[in-house]
Amino acid sequence: NIFKLHNEVCIFKFMDKFYVRELQIVNERVFLRSFNKKYADIMISNLRDLKCEGRVKKCYYVKEFSRKIQ
């Protein structure tokens, strides 16, 4: 169930593209939150198009970016 991944950083496949983003659920709307301010968050309109391919084990904040991902 995709709702169990709320606030988790994962590798998501959406519309045949892969993203490393944080899953956010706000007012029953699902978003893939970007860590880089240059990119917009992605609003998910159809949950069938979204698939979690894996979880990110470790990430931390650094000054240059909002989070460092390993």
Where are these regions (language model features)?
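Acidic/glycine-rich C-terminal interaction modules and beta/coil loop segments
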Residues: 1-70
